[in-house]
């Protein structure tokens, strides 16, 4: 795949959408390209995450460990960024990623990403704005869940009172 194609894929990733073409070019040029065969593991659940992986070709199965072994939770393909948070802070991989077919990725190490942010501080502000917006959306989406849980807790408390009255 050409550098221009890599840049086009990177540009479609929401976290990188505010990057200018020259910034994406620098990122793509400095990142590491890796190929995986069908069935090969990109990473395991619990592995230390030192950056993000952008899928440029192929399909990846994301799996989590359950009581009966690993279970597929999602299949992702071209243009997916795995490990967005790992670009900014150290953490562990929340799932296993396995190549379903031939897969090519761009590996962006955290150190490289942080250098980009230091070099272009306006990117950090835009990413912060994006994260705040996503956080607000998540909070508002969870509000009805919280209300429903409070409602259920109230019903449960009322039921306990009635049960206590019957036993008395």
Say what each PLM segment does.
Residues 1-7:
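Short acidic alpha-helix initiation/capping motifs at coil-to-helix transition points
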Residues 6, 22-24, 93-94, 111-156:
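A small-molecule sensor/coupling module
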Residues 8, 52, 73-74, 105:
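A residue-level structural signature of the nucleotidyltransferase/glycosyltransferase Rossmann-like core
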Residues 11-65:
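Regulatory nucleotide-sensing modules
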Residues 20, 39, 58-60, 79, ...:
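Short hydrophobic/aromatic patches on the structural cores and recognition surfaces of FHA
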Residues 74-129:
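Cyclic-nucleotide recognition modules
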Residues 162-168:
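Long, low-complexity, intrinsically disordered segments
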């Amino acid at each position: 795949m050409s550098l221009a194609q890599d840049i086009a894929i990177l540009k479609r990733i929401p976290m990188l959408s505010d990057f200018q073409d020259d910034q994406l070019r620098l990122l793509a040029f400095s990142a590491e390209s890796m190929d995986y065969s069908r069935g090969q593991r990109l990473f395991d659940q619990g592995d230390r995450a030192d950056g993000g992986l952008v899928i440029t070709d192929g399909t990846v199965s994301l799996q989590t460990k359950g009581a009966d072994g690993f279970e597929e939770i999602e299949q992702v393909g071209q243009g997916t960024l795995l490990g967005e948070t790992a670009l900014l802070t150290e953490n562990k991989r929340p799932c296993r990623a396995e190549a379903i077919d031939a897969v090519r990725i761009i590996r962006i190490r955290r150190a490289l990403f942080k250098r980009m942010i230091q070099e272009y501080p306006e990117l950090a502000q835009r990413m912060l704005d994006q994260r705040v917006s996503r956080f607000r959306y998540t909070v508002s989406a969870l509000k009805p869940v919280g209300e429903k849980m409070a409602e259920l807790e109230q019903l449960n408390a009322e039921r306990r009172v009635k049960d206590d009255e019957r036993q008395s």
